[in-house]
Amino acid sequence: MAIERYFIREAVKEMLIDEFLEKELRRAGYGGLDIKKTPLGTKVIIFAANPGYVIGRGGRRIRELTRILERQFGLENPQIDVQEIKNPYLNAKVQAVRIAQALERGIHFRRAAYAAMRAIMSNGARGVEIRISGKLTGERAKSVRFYQGYLAKVGNPAETLVSKGYAQALLKLGVIGVKVAIMPPDARLPDEIEIIEKPVEEEVSSNEAE
C-alpha cells in the first residue's frame, strides 16, 4: 500500500505541475512535460513551441521556474530541459490550449474546433478528435465531439500512439473543457481503428464526456 500511495502522490504532483506550467507558459506554446528521477535529482523536460520564452531573457524565467518547482512542488534539485516541439499542430496539448485561448477571445466553439481540425489534418495527422464540454450555448452543459480521419480508440495503440491534451477556457458562463487527441502521420496501426473520411460533429451525453 505504501508503494501505491507513493505512485498516486507522484501522479497527482505531476498533474499539478502540468496545470501550473500550462498557465505560466501558454505564450510559449506549452506542450506538456516529462519528469524523471535521476541520481542527481529530478529532470524536468518541458516541451514548448517557443523554447526561448520558457528560458527567458538571460535565463531569468527558467531560474524562477526551477525555484518554484523546488519550493512549491517539492521536487528534489530540479533540472529543467526545454525541448522544442517541431510541429505544434501535431501536439495535442498545444492544440487544446490554443482552442481554449480562442474560446476566451470570444470565438465560437465550432469555428475554433473546425479551424484547429483543418490545421491539424493539413499538417499530416492521420486523425484527430476534439471534445469541447461545458455551457457552450446556454445554461445546460453539453459536450460536442468533432473528429476526422483514423484514430486508435482502444488498447495499447490508443495509449502509445495517440497524442492527448487537455485545457480549460474560463468564460462568463463557466469553465469549458477542451480535449484533443491526434494520431501522428508516422503511426502504424493494427485493426483497432475508427475510420472517418469527412469531418464530423456530434453532441454526446454528459456521461460520455467524462
Swiss-Prot record:
<dbReference type="InterPro" id="IPR001351">
    <property type="entry name" value="Ribosomal_uS3_C"/>
</dbReference>
<dbReference type="InterPro" id="IPR004087">
    <property type="entry name" value="KH_dom"/>
</dbReference>
<keyword id="KW-0699">rRNA-binding</keyword>
<keyword id="KW-0689">Ribosomal protein</keyword>
<keyword id="KW-0694">RNA-binding</keyword>
<comment type="function">
    <text>Binds the lower part of the 30S subunit head.</text>
</comment>
<comment type="subunit">
    <text>Part of the 30S ribosomal subunit.</text>
</comment>
<dbReference type="Pfam" id="PF07650">
    <property type="entry name" value="KH_2"/>
</dbReference>
<dbReference type="InterPro" id="IPR009019">
    <property type="entry name" value="KH_sf_prok-type"/>
</dbReference>
<keyword id="KW-0687">Ribonucleoprotein</keyword>
<dbReference type="InterPro" id="IPR015946">
    <property type="entry name" value="KH_dom-like_a/b"/>
</dbReference>
<dbReference type="InterPro" id="IPR004044">
    <property type="entry name" value="KH_dom_type_2"/>
</dbReference>
<dbReference type="GO" id="GO:0006412">
    <property type="term" value="P:translation"/>
</dbReference>
<dbReference type="Pfam" id="PF00189">
    <property type="entry name" value="Ribosomal_S3_C"/>
</dbReference>
<protein>
    <recommendedName>
        <fullName>Small ribosomal subunit protein uS3</fullName>
    </recommendedName>
</protein>
<dbReference type="GO" id="GO:0003735">
    <property type="term" value="F:structural constituent of ribosome"/>
</dbReference>
<dbReference type="InterPro" id="IPR027488">
    <property type="entry name" value="Ribosomal_uS3_arc"/>
</dbReference>
<feature type="domain" description="KH type-2">
    <location>
        <begin position="17"/>
        <end position="86"/>
    </location>
</feature>
<dbReference type="InterPro" id="IPR036419">
    <property type="entry name" value="Ribosomal_S3_C_sf"/>
</dbReference>
<dbReference type="InterPro" id="IPR005703">
    <property type="entry name" value="Ribosomal_uS3_euk/arc"/>
</dbReference>
<comment type="similarity">
    <text>Belongs to the universal ribosomal protein uS3 family.</text>
</comment>
<dbReference type="GO" id="GO:0022627">
    <property type="term" value="C:cytosolic small ribosomal subunit"/>
</dbReference>
<dbReference type="GO" id="GO:0019843">
    <property type="term" value="F:rRNA binding"/>
</dbReference>
